[in-house]
């Protein structure tokens, strides 16, 4: 088994102070201290204390009697990041993170899915450009030669270390550089995850502008001039028309949570678009077929996964389910029978009628509905305000769908059917 790549210590000794600077030098010194024997001992004690139920504040206060205060602060912060990372990584308790690096990193499931496609479609040496803390490197590196590049020296060292946690350090070579300045000679495939969490990428209200990244996506697409096999991870809100002809856009969801768009160059593309649902790697691809009919809602309603909707595959899903659309421009589907599918939530229709808030409020109360999940699509209105005005009461739960049917405002009261 290959252990984690252990960077050489290059700062203060394990018993000395840990520099508190926020620049590369300070971050590297803190990393050195955490990777020292005493730092590893402290990380283990922090984890054990938290597992035993001690608060972070009380634990840090006790540990400062034995360790430098800066080292305790670094260790407790790292432990918090490891706890947060447990939702993404199965070995998070042994990995190293920064908060920005963790926020941008793919989940382990998404990284493994992507690495599997790359492994099936390419051979030879791979470049991971902008590797961050190694969220994808952990899946790309095992059994393959990988050049990991990042201009942040702390992230680069963490990436190599984390690859070792997943037994992939042997084939990893790291390079501290701006990805735009390196040569790709000898590289057979490229994966890049350009940074999207930039101050300039945020508009009013600090919302991320879709498609804004560093390096820009146009630079990422141009990599095919050097290496034909290129994979780009992007935000799922990618504007229409951003991706060049011949590329595949894959929308990846974790359950019903849309996580990312993955762009596959023409050398790797298998379809114009696809929807992938994790866990389980359920894949929906476009297929030729008859036009999907439009009709009134039937006994069952299907609410497609956001990955299906973003990939433009709602009609493909309808054909797969033998379903119809309830409106030409709305992404709800309906059918006469319940079906279990990973690509949509299935709902049993209890009530279907033109939308009138007062009438539906009375009907919901008559059904004993005390809690309702409101799903609005194609109708204006503040969901929270509507929910308050309904004044629900009762022991049962339902889904209230507010939408359009044949261009008319429509409401549906639905429940989850019992499916095998």
Where on the chain are the PLM-derived regions?
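SAM-dependent transferase fold signal centered on methyltransferase-like domains
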Residues: 1-420
């Amino acid at each position: 088994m290959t252990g984690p790549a252990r960077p050489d210590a290059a700062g203060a000794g394990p018993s000395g102070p840990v520099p508190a600077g926020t620049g590369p030098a300070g971050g590297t010194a803190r990393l050195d201290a955490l990777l020292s024997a005493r730092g590893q001992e402290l990380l283990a004690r922090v984890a054990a204390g938290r597992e035993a139920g001690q608060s972070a504040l009380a634990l840090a206060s006790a540990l400062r009697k034995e360790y430098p205060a800066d080292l305790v602060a670094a260790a407790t912060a790292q432990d918090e990041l490891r706890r947060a990372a447990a939702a993404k990584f199965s070995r998070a308790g042994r990995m190293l993170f920064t908060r920005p690096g963790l926020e941008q990193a793919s989940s382990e499931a998404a990284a493994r899915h992507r690495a599997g496609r790359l492994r099936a479609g390419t051979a030879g040496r791979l470049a991971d450009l902008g590797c961050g803390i190694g969220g994808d490197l952990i899946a790309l590196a095992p059994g393959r030669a990988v050049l990991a590049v990042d201009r942040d020296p702390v992230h680069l060292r963490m990436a190599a270390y984390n690859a070792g946690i997943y037994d992939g350090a042997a084939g990893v070579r790291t390079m501290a550089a701006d990805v735009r300045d390196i040569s790709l000679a000898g590289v057979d495939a490229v994966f890049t995850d350009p940074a999207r969490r930039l101050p300039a990428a945020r508009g009013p209200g600090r919302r991320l502008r879709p498609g804004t990244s560093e390096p820009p996506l146009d630079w990422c697409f141009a990599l095919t001039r050097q290496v034909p096999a290129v994979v780009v991870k992007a935000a799922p809100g990618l504007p229409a028309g951003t991706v060049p002809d011949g590329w595949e856009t894959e929308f990846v969801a974790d359950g019903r949570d849309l996580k990312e768009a993955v762009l596959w160059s023409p050398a790797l593309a298998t379809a114009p678009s696809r929807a992938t649902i994790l866990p389980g790697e359920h894949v929906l691809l476009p297929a030729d077929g008859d036009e999907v009919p439009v009709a009134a809602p039937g006994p069952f309603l299907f609410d497609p996964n956001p990955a299906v909707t973003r990939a433009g595959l709602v009609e493909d899903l309808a054909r797969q389910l033998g379903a119809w659309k309830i409106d030409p421009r709305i992404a709800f589907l309906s059918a006469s029978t319940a079906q279990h599918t990973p690509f949509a939530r299935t709902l049993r229709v209890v009530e279907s009628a033109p939308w009138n808030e007062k009438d539906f409020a009375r009907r919901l109360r008559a059904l004993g509905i005390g809690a309702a999940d409101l799903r609005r699509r194609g109708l204006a209105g503040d969901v929270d305000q509507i929910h308050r005005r309904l004044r629900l009461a009762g022991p049962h739960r339902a889904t209230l769908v507010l939408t359009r049917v044949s261009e008319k405002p429509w409401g549906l009261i639905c429940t989850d059917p019992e499916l095998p």
